[in-house]
Amino acid sequence: MKYGVSQLSVVPGREEPSDPSEMVTQILFGEHYKIIEERAKWVKVRLSYDKYECWIDRIQAFEVTKDVYNAIETSKSWATSIDLAAIGIDINKDSMIPLLMGSSLPNYENGKCRWGENVFEFSGMTVKSESGISREKIVDNAMMYVNAPYLWGGRSPFGIDC
């Protein structure tokens, strides 16, 4: 079995291994998955958080070891981005990555999330998994989705599925 984690802002998950195939979900930054099937240009993944299966373009898949996957899976130090959009910095590549609200920040401490050798700096607003979130903040976040356009499989205020 192979494993992966999204290192891109958002990756389209498709019904079939084909560019014109409908998008059925989106994988946000920091979400991890198991690779359950491979083709020349495509990999089929099973998302950890909801067990949803979809195809992603191989060039958008980032493989990690089983140990790294398990470390993410069992991490007690999670955070989630709650800014509409924010900037993350890939420390190893010195490059910026836009992060959408709901992006996962595994092993998050002191403004950085990490998996394996990969370290990302994040200065946006977060909610840490162990701290919970207030009712008021849930309502504030929900309001960011008001007037969001409908997008089949979408998972952000820039396009959301029902």
Residues of each region from the PLM?
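Intrinsically disordered, low-complexity polar regions and short flexible loop motifs
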Residues: 20
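OB/S1-fold single-stranded nucleic-acid-binding modules
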Residues: 7-9
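Active-site nucleophilic cysteine motif
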Residues: 156-162
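Boundary regions of SH3-family modules and the immediately adjacent low-complexity/disordered segments
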Residues: 1-3, 25, 29-34, 39-40, ...
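Surface-exposed patches in mature extracellular/periplasmic domains of secreted proteins
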Residues: 150-154
